[in-house]
């Protein structure tokens, strides 16, 4: 509810949209990328199409401090990356990558064979290029699959229901109750660590 992620000529950026009418760029929340284009958010990662540099894996577990974990280019084979979509089948996660002049690429990101912690909440991806499909022209986009969610407009009103039926989505004022006090200030927690069983 509080963050928007964008790409521009400088790279991948995070905006604070606690007040959607007054979005603010978060200081220090920019990951420089030379060719940042479309991206996909999945759990604690942002996967960013980064042109000739391949696919950027950005840790967004703390959205106010995103960090580049790695750039993956499959030994130079991914060199015109324009867009990415992530999907899962059984215990494996895949990335469909529009790799421009090279066509459509399929990466196996997580599987029981290559990621021992594949059943965890957000396992560290270990990408492997497993397929290429040549396209008639440059592959510049990948159609977004059915994410089984609802589309809402800027005011929180439902505009579309995808693969399921049920209650309506929350309105803006209802969402704010999850992260704001009645006076408008944000709910916060103290960032503490445990060492030898004691909080520090």
Regions found by a protein language model. Name each.
Residues 1-200:
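Feature marking well-ordered beta-strand scaffolds used for ligand recognition
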């Amino acid at each position: 509810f509080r963050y928007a992620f964008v790409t521009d000529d400088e790279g991948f950026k995070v905006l604070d949209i606690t007040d959607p009418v007054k979005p603010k760029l978060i200081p220090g929340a920019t990951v420089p990328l030379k060719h940042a284009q479309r991206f996909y958010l999945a759990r604690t990662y942002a996967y960013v199409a980064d042109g000739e540099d391949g696919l950027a894996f950005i840790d967004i577990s703390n959205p106010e401090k995103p960090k580049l974990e790695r750039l993956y280019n499959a030994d130079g084979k991914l060199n015109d990356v324009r867009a990415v979509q992530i999907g899962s089948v059984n215990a494996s996660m895949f990335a469909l990558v529009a790799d421009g002049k090279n066509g459509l690429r399929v990466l196996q990101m997580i599987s029981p064979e290559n990621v021992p912690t594949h059943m965890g909440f957000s396992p560290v991806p270990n990408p492997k290029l497993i397929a290429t499909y040549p396209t008639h022209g440059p592959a510049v986009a990948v159609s977004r699959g059915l994410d089984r969610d609802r589309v809402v407009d800027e005011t929180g009103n439902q505009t579309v229901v995808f693969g399921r039926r049920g209650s309506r989505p929350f309105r803006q004022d209802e969402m704010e109750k999850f992260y704001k006090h009645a006076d408008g200030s944000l709910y916060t927690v103290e960032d503490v660590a445990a060492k030898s069983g004691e909080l520090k």
